[in-house]
Amino acid sequence: MIFQQNRIFNYSLAVNICFYSSNYIKIYIMKLILLIFLILSSFSINAAFSIEVSISEQRLYLYEKNKLIRSYPVSSSAYGEGQVENSLKTPLGMHKIKSKIGTNVDKYHFFVSREHIPQKVDIINEKIDTEDDFITSRIMWLDGLNEGYNKGLNVDSFKRFIYIHGTHEEGLIGEKASHGCIRMLNHDVLELYELIPEETTVNIFL
């Protein structure tokens, strides 16, 4: 009789263990599937957009799923193209947008060390180099993807503070005029900022 009760108890215990183990496994699998879905969704959103910056044309091209949807005039560096820190040159190669800065900041307001200064700058529409380098409206901070070329050591685009940003020298857009960054018209940089997510790739080429 005792032996039979033990068998019943052991069977019941085994059933309960299997039941709880099964539920735990199901919950774990569901969480894993959800995590994979979120990762793939994020990748899909980011991969949908890509940016090409042509130095020779002084234009930025925005693609969605390999289809051109926007084209903007820009200004790259007045000092030419190069990767080395303190050169003031525009780096070439593949980058990604590491950080977007300036959401809800008023148009023509400017930044100092990426901190918003709630004050509008005077926009220069003539082809005049004021020797100032106001960063206005929005910032998209670039991070190099080519190790040893535009990432790491003394050729790191992110540590060089290379941005896509608005400028007060709008009259010089379309010409090489920046100190290394990619400058845009303020209304253009506002639009681009809203269209693309962080992690969007940016290819800068001659």
Residue ranges of each PLM-predicted region?
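Cationic, low-complexity basic patches in intrinsically disordered or flexible, solvent-exposed regions
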Residues: 5
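Sec-dependent signal peptide recognition
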Residues: 30-36
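A structural motif detector for short, solvent-exposed N-terminal "entry" segments of globular domains
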Residues: 47-80
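Extracytoplasmic
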Residues: 48, 55-57, 69, 92, ...
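Exported/periplasmic cell-wall-interacting domains
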Residues: 88, 105-206
